[in-house]
Amino acid sequence: FFLALYFIGLGTSNIRDGWFFEAEVGKKVLRRRLRRGMPLVLAAIIPRVTLQKINDALELGEGETASEIYDRSKENAEPNLEMFIHVTKDGFGAIGHVDICYKGRIISFGNYDTNSERLFGMMGDGVLFSADREKYIEFCKRENHKTLLGYGLALSPEQLAAVDKEIAKLMSLTVPWDPPKTVKPKRPGIDKEEPMYAYKLKQEADGRLYKFTSSKFKTYFVMSTNCVLLADTIVGAAGTDILSVRGFISPGTYQGYLDKEFERPHSLVVTKRVYQ
């Protein structure tokens, strides 16, 4: 019964897109609409499934590199903002991570202060960081063996102004944070000191880190105030669809949305790239 209701809702959403498609050709409006996505359990595996498809294609010799297999671009595409979906083959990284790149700098959010972690890392101080794009991509591939799926968006001047305003608003709620070199051992004198990921990010990717003094992002929680919500808060200022009314958006949900938007001829998403 509930599955039937879901597919009815999904069909209604797609029909709605068709009705309004012609009216939106060539337009990049700032109005946000509710978009119904696939069930969360299915959406969660999208990044990992995509990675597997790329790796399988490489093994079958369908291309010499992952880029030859995956990369696509619309005609005359000139993206001015990127969204990255991170994915690893194993572990929690298979669920994915989301950040954006704007004006040559990565903007990301997460529980990067390991010393503040609670609930097995599901909660902690919310940390926003900015990093050099090229250095960050190489850092992610080297440090975590990640594959990054990049989606280029072509925004209008009005949309870029809205994004600038939202970033400035978020930054006004933060103060700089200087991460320690190592994580505090849980059992001093027994446990070995481990390097702090945030410190390495600062040193190797020109990272600039910040903590929130107020706002919902002051505390990171994997099921609500997570990396996807921060990215959606910024990009949503440009008028992208609302993907959840419940507050939780998984990286896979966002990737599914970006993939679908890329297939639309006149959408904001104009390129797809893989970095492996």
Predicted segments with their positions:
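Active-site nucleophilic cysteine motif
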Residues: A94-I95, F217-P251
